[in-house]
Amino acid sequence: WDLKHEKRGSVRASLFFIALAIATFYYQAIGQGYLLNPRNRYSSLWAQMIGVVVPLFLFVLANWCLTTLFDGEGSFKDVFIACSYSLAPIPLLVIPATIYSNFCVSAETDIIGFIGTLAFIWLGILVFFGTMVTHDYSLGKNFVTILGTLIAMVFIMFIAVLFTTLIGKIVSLITNIVTEIQYRM
């Protein structure tokens, strides 16, 4: 409500929440205890950035495209701010769980998994109600819109893969044509 009607949200703060979520997942990847990360698999900051930014951007884009067609009141910026602010539970719960993972025994690893699951459930609830308030939808219409957004995300990913493959084929064709012309000369 405050983000939409009282204009308390900003893009700068949204970018801060995104950076905080990326840093949290990076810390989780390198800071988990041995019980949860026995092979010392570390992830790069780049991988964590892609893992946060790409799904967020896909959701915001798909939601904005879909709600533009179905009388949504939110702009792209409003949807971005609402979804970015929804990332707040991630550092609040994942960082303490990661710290706790260094001291827990094997019987307590389920608690850490539960805390991580709780963070994502809280995130989902915030995204759901944030988009509902942003677009001024009823509960049922927002539920249908969220399902449509998820389908649109899959469709956008399919189009992106198709486009990337097509560009690769065109580059390969041009390379083959240039190679054949060089052989003929």
Predicted regions and their residues:
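Selected alpha-helical membrane-embedding segments in polytopic membrane proteins
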Residues: 1-77
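Context-gated lysine
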Residues: 4-7, 77, 141, 169, ...
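Hydrophobic alpha-helical transmembrane segments and adjacent short intramembrane/lumenal linkers
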Residues: 63-158
